[in-house]
Amino acid sequence: MFKETLRECMEGHTLAERKAEQVMDAIMKGEATASQIASLLTVLRFRGETVAEMTGFARAMRRHSIQIEHSFSQVVDTCGTGGDDVGTFNISTATALLVSALGVPVAKHGNRAVSSKSGSADVLEALQIPIQSSPEEATASLQKHNMCFMFAPLYHVAMKHAVAPRKEIGFRTIFNLLGPLTNPARAEHQLIGVYDRNFAEKMAETLRRLGTKHSLLVAGHGGLDELSITGPSTVFEVKGDAIDRYELIPEDVGLERGDLAQIQVSTVQESATLIDQVLIGKANKSAQQIVLLNAGAALYAADRVDSIKAGVALAKEGIASGHVADHVRNLRQTDQEAEQHA
């Protein structure tokens, strides 16, 4: 089946959703060789992935993933595709910490750095915030702290068959787009950062087909996979069965434009230090405002506020009150308590 599929793709044909699901199912079961997987990823990258293919692949990945159980009806994820090559600090992780401090359950789906300076798992460790090592621990953390981190390799075990081919070919593949669409906590409210607006549009349509309550897919100025503080961002808002596209600038939500250099870092520790400063309101203006902007969008996606602007205001209040700093302190104490009992 796989050889036939490769031949069809090489000839320029696209896969129907059901066929794409079967192909990914074969990959997840270890029925495709490393060279076959690499060939498929290469063909798709150069030909361009269709929404039907992305939807079928995502359905299969979701089915093969380990999921966590929880009692929340409005879980949020702030996960991006990565790969923007801009070198910013971990904005989506800072956003997750801020939003969870405001009472919104956040199931952060992420990984270690591959091509970037710092992955979400790396920076959380640098912040001494626990990374849960099992679904049970993740559920307990989500219930107790409104925040858990789901380390992607632990939940997408079947992805092991694609790890070597992805590393060997070395370029972005469809898997970069599928990760944010396969949250193990079944988050139906998402803020997804995408490095390219064309991919953001495809992902929005894919998410609409998969089903979501309210999600924002954002592509920032200069290829940033976050809402940008330095220029306009393109937003695809998916609410139920509808998709709305619009441009957003910082001034629209009461913020000022910032400087890219102020949000760039060279190491994991620099990223962690900047996040710490943001969450106590002591960071440089650009770093402070880009987290407020993205937190405002996440709060809006979570349906906790009626607009991104209102979300920005709520995020500002949370930092100014010291509540966010207290929340981070509680998360750190959990890590220290675990070490004492180890």
Curated annotation (Swiss-Prot):
Enzyme class at the top of the EC tree: transferase
BP terms from Gene Ontology: L-tryptophan biosynthetic process
Binding-site list for 5-phospho-alpha-D-ribose 1-diphosphate: 80, 83-84, 88, 90-93, 108-116, 120
Keywords attached to this entry: Amino-acid biosynthesis, Aromatic amino acid biosynthesis, Glycosyltransferase, Magnesium, Metal-binding, Transferase, Tryptophan biosynthesis
HAMAP family: TrpD
Protein name: Anthranilate phosphoribosyltransferase
Any one GO cellular component localisation term in the record: cytosol
Positions with a binding annotation for Mg(2+) 2: 225-226
Task of the protein: Catalyzes the transfer of the phosphoribosyl group of 5-phosphorylribose-1-pyrophosphate (PRPP) to anthranilate to yield N-(5'-phosphoribosyl)-anthranilate (PRA).
Binding site for Mg(2+) 1: 92, 226
Keyword presence, Amino-acid biosynthesis: yes
Natural source organism: Halalkalibacterium halodurans (strain ATCC BAA-125 / DSM 18197 / FERM 7344 / JCM 9153 / C-125) (Bacillus halodurans)
One annotated GO molecular function: anthranilate phosphoribosyltransferase activity
Family classification: Belongs to the anthranilate phosphoribosyltransferase family.
Pfam families in alphabetical order: Glycos_trans_3N (PF02885), Glycos_transf_3 (PF00591)
Pathway as given in its UniProt record: Amino-acid biosynthesis; L-tryptophan biosynthesis; L-tryptophan from chorismate: step 2/5
Binding annotation for anthranilate 2: 166
Quaternary structure and partners: Homodimer.
Reported cofactor(s): Mg(2+)
Free-text comment on the cofactor: Binds 2 magnesium ions per monomer.
Residues holding anthranilate 1: 80, 111
Lineage: Bacteria, Bacillati, Bacillota, Bacilli, Bacillales
Name of encoding gene: trpD
Catalytic activity, reaction form: N-(5-phospho-beta-D-ribosyl)anthranilate + diphosphate = 5-phospho-alpha-D-ribose 1-diphosphate + anthranilate
EC number(s) per entry: 2.4.2.18
